[in-house]
Amino acid sequence: MNNNVYIKSTSSYLPNNPIENDRMEDYIGKIEGKPSRVKNLVLRQNGITSRYYALTTNQEITHTSAMLASEAIKKLFQDLHMLSNVELVTTATSIPDQILPSHASMVHGLLPETKNIEIFSTSGVCLTSLQALKIAYLSIASGDKKNAVCCASELVSAALLSKHYDAEYERCHNIGENPYFGFEKDFLRFMLSDGAGAVLMDNTPNETGDTLKIEWIDMESNANTLPACMIAGADFNEDGSITTWKSYNSHEISDKSVFTVKQDIRLLKKHIINLWVNHIEKVLKKHKVKAEDINYIIPHVSSMFFYKELLKEIENRNIDLKENKWFTNLTSVGNMGSASIFVALDELFKSGKLKKANNILLLVPESGRFSYGTALLTVI
C-alpha cells in the first residue's frame, strides 16, 4: 500500500432527545401491557442511564437507519456542497431498513449532493463498522480512491417494540442469581438503542487541527469453530444450529418471533471475553505494538458488566492496557451496535483531550458468531 490514510473529521447523530431509564417502556412498549420483570436488573448490570430512540411514545418511527446515516454524514462537512467531492461511501448496520436494495443504496439516495459514486454495504453485527472502515481504508491506501466516507447506523428500537414479542418472552427464571441469566429473555430490549456515527477519510491530513492517521485495521472470525450466538431472521434449534426464516411459513414466523433479535447467553458467557483478549494479544504482537505505548483505548462493550469482565481478563493476562486509558460513553448514549465505536471516537476526538502522537486503540467484538476487530490510530 502506497498511501497513508487519514480521518479528517468525525461526526455522530443521535435522534430526538435522550431517554432516561424510567421512560424506556413509554417508547418501546410493554409486553402484554405489563412492565418488564427484568428491566431493572438488566439496567443495573449494563450501567446505561440514558439512550436515544428514533421513536415516538406512540411507537412510531421518526428516522430510518438510512436517514440516521445520512444525517451523520452531512455533519462531517461544513458545506454540503463538499459532498460532491466524495468518491466512496461505505456503510455498516446490523439490521437494515429493508432486505433489498442495499443499505448503502438507501443512504446514497439521501445524499443528492454526491455524484454517481461507488458504494459499499457490510452485513453482520457490531463489527460491520470496522469492516466498512477497512474497505474505505484499503481503497484509499491502494490509490483506487482519494477519499471516502464511512458510516455506521442502527435503528434497532423498531425491532424491540412490544408488538413483536409474545407473553412467553416475559417468563424469565433465576433472575438475579447469575448476571447472565437475567439477560435471557427480554434483556436485549433494554440493551440496544439508535444512532449513527461517521468518519471522513482522505489520503492527505488536515492543514490545521488534529488528524487521525489509520495505522492498521485487523479482524478475525471464529465462525469456523463456533456456532451462531446472536441471530435475527432465524431461530435456534436444540443442537445449537439455526433455522432461517426462509424455512418457515408466515404463521410460524409470527408465532416464533423469528425476526426478533435473540442471543444464546450461555454461549456468550463461555466465549466472548476470552476470545476477545486472545485477539487483542494476537494483533498487538503481530503489529509489534507495546501495550504501554497506547494512550487511549475505546472498547465497544454492550454493558458495563462486560466492560469490567474485559478489564479483569486483560489484567489477569498482564497486558498493560490500564483502565485510566479507557474511554467509553456507553452509559450516556447507550449501545448502538455498529455505530457505537464511531460515536465514541467522535466524542473523544472533539473532547480536547488528544495530543499529537497519541495512539488510540479501537476494540470491537461481535457476538453474532464471535468475530473481533482492532484498529490503531495516531493523532498527527
What are these regions (language model features)?
Residues 7, 57-125, 289-308:
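Conserved beta-ketoacyl condensing-enzyme motif
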Residues 7-9, 42, 89, 107, ...:
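Buried hydrophobic positions in well-ordered alpha/beta secondary-structure cores of metabolic enzymes
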